[in-house]
Each structure stands twice: as C-alpha cells, then as structure tokens.
C-alpha cells in the first residue's frame, strides 16, 4: 500500500486548498466538449485535433466521481506549467507542482513488449529511428552524429533529401541492437517504455519531462546509460559498455524491474482513481 501511496503523491503533489480556473469542467461538460470537437472535425470538416484517446482515458476515471465535481485539464504534449492544478499527460520534471499526471493516451505511450532476442546475440551498435521535426534536440542529434560508425540513426519522417534520412524500422528490427537511443521529442521519449521492457538498454540524456511512467525517478547508469545533453560522450560510453556487457545486463535488469510496477492493470486503475480523489479532496 505504501508503494501505491508514494506513486499517488508523486503524480499529484498538491497538499493544500486551491482554486479551480474558470475553465474547469464536470465530467458531463468534458463529454460535451469532446462531442463538439468530433462534430467540428467530421461534420464541419474543420482541422480540429480530436484527442480521443486522451478523452476516454480521463473520462473513464472521472466517471467514478460525483457529477458536480470539476477539474482543469489540458490534453496534448505539455512542457509548461499552470497557475492552478491541471490534469495533464506530461509535465516538466522540475517545478511542476500544479501539473497533475494521469495516464492519458496510454494506447500510444504504454507499449511494453516481450523481447525474444537474448542480449548476447544482439548487434554491438546503437539504433534510433523517429520523427525529428518536433524536437530541435533530435534534429541536432541526427545531423551531428548520423555518421558515427557504431550508430544506425536517422529520421524516417518527414522525408528529406539528406544523408540522415533512413527508412522506417519496426520495433522487431530495432530489438536486434544492444543499445537504443531514447530521445525526447515534443515532450518525453515515447519509445522509452518498450525499450526498458526489452533485453536492450536505453541510452539517453537525463530526461527533462515525465509522464505516468515517472521518468523523473529513473536513475542514470542504473536504469539507463546516461549521456550528455549534446550527445558528445555517447560514442565513448557505448564503446565502454560494449566491453563491459555484464554491467549492461545489470542496467537492463533494473530497467525491467522498474517497468514491472506498471503491468498490473487493476493496480494502475486504483492509482488513477486515488490521484483524482486526492485532487478533489482539496
């Protein structure tokens, strides 16, 4: 029970009375807003972001509470803070007391896998594929390090006539590599969940944003191989760990253990309910 309470307090750091904003909604109003979005999108043919998975993930938990309860929320990739406590999918790790994390858009962000490939037979290389235009960090990374011999990195979208453009690579192919870069995009690195559930090791700078996965609790060189923000030491660190496979296996085991806490769906639902219950208690 202590581990559950610890996670609830991590996601929801509010411990004093607060005022809702004028935009706060009941669950019925949340539903009505979503229907308006869908009408604009499909009937009026307007370019409105549906955020359907966000809506269902919040609506399903919100529905357990009295109809008069209200909350503030913001869907999407959130990297800023709020003047009043607000339900979000992601937040900055530092100074984000008013950002209350819920497990939103889980279908995209919580993809754990069973890796059939033993670490010892994987390639002594580092892989990354992804969308680069949503992150200056990713653009810098691939433009400056695409030609490192032990890296197979590149953007698969958008398509560009540049040497760092590479074809899409499915997860099953990426799992053939011992080292997998997890580079933050619009907010967090989406691939971090499946990488940390695999028999490969996550390589990344210290994360700046977090989600329900609690990226802020990950320990460098314990749960992942830590590299500098400018990636300048990535090649040296990977070469070091290629020569020290037992150290890598320990990191992978720690990462797998961290992932295990998210696999009990009944427990995850309970934590979600308790996060909102704490929100409404103030």
Feature locations, PLM:
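Residue-level recognition of alpha-helix termini/interfacial anchor residues
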Residues: 137, 144-145, 233, 244, ...
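C-terminal "capping" alpha-helix adjacent to the active site of nucleotide-linked donor transferases
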Residues: 228-247
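C-terminal alpha-helical cap of glycosyltransferases
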Residues: 265-282
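Hydrophobic alpha-helical packing elements
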Residues: 234, 251, 267-268
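Non-transmembrane alpha-helical segments in soluble domains
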Residues: 138-143, 238-239, 256, 273-276
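Nucleotide-sugar donor-binding catalytic core of glycosyltransferases
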Residues: 1-198, 205-227, 237
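A short, well-ordered alpha-helix in the C-terminal region of glycosyltransferases
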Residues: 247-261
